Each structure stands twice: as structure tokens, then as C-alpha cells.
């Protein structure tokens, strides 16, 4: 799952933006949700791109 974290000061100015993701692609600003079509290394899934079905999958929850 992806979470976009933002912090604002009292004037409403954006101070910090960080993408929290379980994927190894941490510099991406957006990711494709599970169930969407993907190709490895082309569309970045929030989880991972299944090489067989070409569909974004969520990482298993532990």
C-alpha cells in the first residue's frame, strides 16, 4: 500500500513530502494500484508487477 505523507507549517506551506511504500522504488511520486495492467520496469506498482498475468499485485500481508 502507498501513503503520501505531507507536513505543513502554520501558514499551510508544504515542508516535507515522502512516499512510504513497501516496494524498492522509493523515489517514485506515484504508483499503480493492485488490479491495474503493468509491465515490469515500465509501470510502477504499489506492490509488484506479476510477470505472468501482467497485473499489479499487493505484497502479502504478514
From Swiss-Prot:
GO MF annotation list: calcium channel regulator activity; toxin activity
GO cellular component, one term: extracellular region
Cleavable signal peptide: 1-7
Entry comment describing in which tissues the protein is expressed: Expressed by the venom duct.
Keyword Ubl conjugation tagged: no
Cellular compartments annotated: Secreted
Domain of life: Eukaryota
UniProtKB keywords: Calcium channel impairing toxin, Disulfide bond, Ion channel impairing toxin, Knottin, Neurotoxin, Secreted, Signal, Toxin, Voltage-gated calcium channel impairing toxin
Disulfide cysteine pairs (residue numbers): 31-46, 38-49, 45-56
Notes on the domains: The presence of a 'disulfide through disulfide knot' structurally defines this protein as a knottin.
Described purpose of this protein according to its UniProt entry: Omega-conotoxins act at presynaptic membranes, they bind and block voltage-gated calcium channels (Cav).
Family as reported in the entry's similarity comment: Belongs to the conotoxin O1 superfamily.
UniProt-recorded name of the protein: Omega-conotoxin-like Bu11
Annotated organism of origin: Conus bullatus (Bubble cone)
